[in-house]
Amino acid sequence: MVELPESLAGLPEPVAERVRVVASRRYPAAGTFVLHWMHTALRVEENPALDTARFLATRLNLPLLVYQGLSERYPYACDRHHAFILQGARETHRELAAAGIPSVFHLERPGHRGPHLRTLAGRAAAVVTEDFPTAPISDWLPRVAERAAGPVFAVDTACVVPMRLVGRAYDRAFSYRDATAAMRAARLARPWFTVARTQFASVAPVVANTAAPTASTSVSTPAPPPVPPSAPPSASPSAPPSAPPPAPPPSTAFDLPFEPLDWERIEEDRAGLARLIGDCDIDHTVGPIADTPGGSRAGYERWNAFRRSGLARYAYDRNDPLRAGTSRLSAYLRYGMVSPLRIAREAAAVMAAGGGGKAGAEKFLDELLVWRELAYTFCHYRRDHGTVAAIPGWAQRTLADHQADRRPALFDAESLARGCTGDPLWDAAQRSLRVRGELHNNVRMTWGKALVGWTPDLATAWRHLVDLNHQFALDGRDPSSYGGLLWCVGQFDRPFTPPQPVFGTVRTRPLKDHAMRLDPDQYREQVDRPAGGSAPRVAVIGAGVAGLIAARTLADSGFEVSVFEKSRGAGGRAATRRAEPKLAFDHGAQYFTAYDPRFRQAVETWIEQGLAARWPAPLVQIGPAGVAAKTDQPERFVFVPGMSAIGRHLAKDLSIRGDLRIARVESRPAGWELIDTAGQSQGQFDYAVVAVPSPQAADLLGDHPFAAEARAVPMTPCWAAMAAFERRVDTAWDGAFLHESPLAWVSRNSAKPGRDPSSDCWVLHATADWTAANLDLPKDEAARQLLAAFGHSVEQSAAAGQGGRCGASHSTPDGQAAPLPATIHLDAHRWMFSATPLTLDRQCLWDDASQLALCGDWLAGGRIEGAYRSGAAAAGCVLRKAGLATP
């Protein structure tokens, strides 16, 4: 056992045995407070890390500061995880204030970023935090320790048998159960002690820092008497002390390097929490869960209800999700909002009482204290737990031996995430993860095993297992999650013979067998049952990329969504015009780029599906100075076989009413009513998402304040000519940006990936100024003039040695020969709302009171990526409104 420093002498044994020394240093003379970094034990009751920090602050005669931060950069950061953590933090910091303990919360977002934890650690006399063995905490802790000025202690707050006492990782539950039996029994029989304020002195005032230790002296403050282990547990985590606690020092007393959240202000603003989450640069397409709010109160309410009515039957009902036989505590345990120590004690009391509840309590404790803590201990000692290296050698070998076996099917990441495999049981399970943020453990085992058979190799299966679980599950990224996922690929298990296809000797759990004991239709009905009785109705006006992303995100999240589109097709300016089978033109958006990591992830999935491809085209700039290669080229992508493919893809499975123009969106007491151009109502909806160009949005909204904001964002028109030639235009490039020309851009459409190269098809985009000056030209005349300008550009290119004459030529209106072959097709299309020189850079507009969202590329920097991000942001606003309960 690691010896603790003298400053922690007298720390009660139930706490002391949990402390791990991360960095052993002398206490710095300049340290002005003890810092408790709180992250995965969001509770005041039975919190060994908080108790250790309070004890140490008392010993050092220094104030205690509790710091909690929420980063935008943790893996799978999204509204769901952010909301759950913030809800729990709001309650915890309220209880800390009631206990007289100063606490601050830093929420990373634009204007509020920086390495503030490391800054505080560098000024603290000591740092105390929770010992949590999975990323990102396990990665961040060494960095914090490196920057800390004083010692750093990590305290196990998650396990009844502390991880550090187990000594090693176990790969079988029975081995772990036997090895820890004595330690577990001793701790279950020992009530948790009470941290009384008469024994842990109140926090010292900031100005009373007279006994701060120096670098060369030990702490001389006498230890407070330890609380006897047999002391009765606190009757209530928030019971008032015998004397009012002193007022905590203001946050300004700690010279904070950031502005902490003002919880009182957030409480006063009904939409404050949702707005803060919306400001964060995280995934807004995974929304909060309305019936699973964060916080100790909600967690213990769930536990008490289960203890009363479910615990006794747990052994019999736990494997059937239709019986609601589980505690559903995993998310609360994952973030330490409930104490596993208390849960275990109370379950053990039921078991000890005997009678009908004994079997259920005994099985529950086995899951809580053996399987769960087996996973925590495994992750603690196996730092490779997040990789396939953590899988037993026999499992790795047998899966490798069967890697070439024929798979029943292969699915891409998007189809899996959306639950679109065609297997009713698996799709219902994935929908439970996506919509409810949880998955019944017995179903999770079958769900996870299926991915082994649906992916080409172990590495891909593991990646999908981790991504799907951690993105959607509220209990994701914790040791229990890794334990369950590792079990799916052979860990904590033994070989099964004879070998099976794909799996080898890894245990199988066929979906068809599970469907015989769990009716997929009943399970899907349970998963889809709205928490409020009926699914919220959402109207999306506009089936461009922004509208489709918003609509599909909400439909996948359980909303009843109707899309209204004035055109016959979907996709907006991501459009493709076909003149005949071999002639196709992307006459709207030409290509797209991907800078945002979440959009980039979607693009990689589209590439995997064959829906998109990289376009490494040779591009040039043509102007008065000549022709120059475009050197500052980002990676460009196109949709396949045309840009309109994305509209068809996103529109699949959506209810779209096409060729229908909405004239007005009118506010009603219960939401919004849509009126078409014939004056007919198209229905009333709880939410409205307007996803059309800014001038059209302004017309739809009447006197709503957003109408003025939309009207302030102009959109420019664009003439687009489409030309096909009898022979190839002789250029060394496939696309060009033009300057001082009627044209802004030209591209060889037939050179894009997935296009028919047998015909030479070009798209010619006019400048906004030329289009505005020639807005009323007949389209045939606009096409002829733009073709002439193209010929002039090709002539410039030829003169610069970049290709040129192609044989036959045609005459321009001024009689000059143009170096172009004869056209076999020439047409034009006028885009009235093509682009905007000014965007609001707001992602979307949201009116919380009326439940109205505006989205579109005109709000988010333009282009397809901007439209995607704006649609996702609008969906996030609706998801947060529906998923965040009023405090």
Where are each of the predicted segments found?
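Central helical "cap/lid" subdomain
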Residues: G571, E580, F585, S681-F737
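Active-site substrate-recognition segment that forms the wall
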Residues: M722-L775, E781, Q785-V794
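A conserved short coil-to-beta-strand element within the FAD-binding core of flavoproteins
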Residues: G658-E673
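Glycine-rich FAD pyrophosphate-binding loop
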Residues: A555-E580
